[in-house]
Design a protein with these regions (language model features):
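Basic, low-complexity segments
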Residues: 1-13
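Conserved phosphate-binding loops in nucleotide/dinucleotide-binding enzymes
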Residues: 17
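Long, charge-rich, low-complexity alpha-helical segments
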Residues: 24-73
Length: 73
């Protein structure tokens, strides 16, 4: 995990957030998936930086990019 993305069990139900905020990584990803640009995300969350958006994407990539292990038949 990057310094920009943190998990605190006492904030936002323990979901990943941008450090120092209550903005969930999922909120940023939902906006991007819905067609918003990085610039539009930053307009909606003016206290974020472009690096926070990129860190959210990197976090999502790390979460889905894992080795697939198959059990022997």
């Amino acid at each position: 995990m990057s310094e920009r993305i943190v998990i605190n069990p006492e904030v936002c139900g323990g979901r990943p957030i941008v450090a120092g905020t209550r903005v969930r990584v999922a909120d940023i990803l939902a906006m991007l998936a819905g067609g918003a640009s990085e610039a539009e995300v930053l307009v909606d969350f003016p206290y974020l930086k472009a690096e926070d958006v990129r860190a959210s994407l990197a976090y999502a990539l790390q979460a889905v990019d894992h080795s697939i292990v198959q059990a022997a038949a």
